[in-house]
Amino acid sequence: MRILIAGNWKMNGSRHQLDAWVDAMMAAGSVGVDLLVCPPFTLIERAARLLAGSGVAVGGQDCHAAAEGAFTGDVSAVMLRDVGATHVIVGHSERRAGYAESDAAVRRKAEAALAAGLAPIVCVGETADQRRAGTQKQVIGAQLDGSLPPGFSGIVAYEPVWAIGTGLVPSLADVAAMHAFILGRCGATQVLYGGSV
C-alpha cells in the first residue's frame, strides 16, 4: 500500500490559486506517494480537469446522504462523482461539531459515497478532554462502530480534535498507537493523520 497524502483546502482557494498549485505540482513531478486534493466544491470540476492523467486524485470535503432532493446548499456524492471527484471526506471534526453530525449521519454519508462510486475518507478523533481522561480509544472505537458502514474496507482519517489548527502536535508514538488501534478495530485499508504537524 502506497502512502496517501491528502490536502483539505477547507473554505479556501480560487481558480487562480488552483491553477498556480497545479502548475507547481506538475513542475515537481512524481513524488513517490499517492496524492489527493480536496478543494471547495466550486473548484472540484476544474481541479479534476487540470489534474487528469497526473495521478493526483480529487475529492470533495463532504456530501449529503441523499442522492438528490430539496436540500438547499448541500451536494450529493453523485454530484461529486459527476464533476470528477474520486474521494470524499465525511465526518470531519469541524462538521461533527459545527453541524452536530452524529456517527449515524456520517455512516449514511459514507454509504452514499460508496453507492456513488466514491472512496469515503471517514474521520474520527478525540477532544483534549477525552485524551486527558484517557478515554481516546473508547471514543475512537465508538466513532468507528457508529460511522463505518458494515464490511467497510477503506480510508479512515485520525484527526485528534485538539491538534487541528492549534499548533499542538501529538508524538509520533501516540499517532502510531492510534493508527494501530484503528487498523486492528476495523477494515480500514489506510489510516491518515489529520492535525498539526
What does each of the following model-derived ranges do?
Residues 1-75, 145-152, 157:
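Conserved N-terminal beta1-alpha1 strand-loop-helix module at the mouth
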Residues 6, 59-62, 88-94, 121-125, ...:
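Short beta-strands and strand-loop turn motifs
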Residues 11, 41-43, 62-64, 94, ...:
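Active-site-proximal loop/turn and secondary-structure-junction residues that shape catalytic pockets
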Residues 34, 54-60, 119, 185-193:
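Short beta-strand/loop segments at the ligand-binding rim of alpha/beta enzyme cores
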Residues 36-40, 68, 98-101, 130-142:
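Active-site glycine- and acidic-residue-rich loops that bind
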Residues 39, 90, 158, 166, ...:
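Glycine-rich beta-strand-to-loop/alpha-helix junction loops that act as flexible
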Residues 52-112:
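Glycine/small-residue-rich loop that forms an oxyanion/phosphate-binding "nest" at active or ligand-binding sites
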Residues 116-187:
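Active-site rim beta-loop-alpha module in soluble metabolic enzymes
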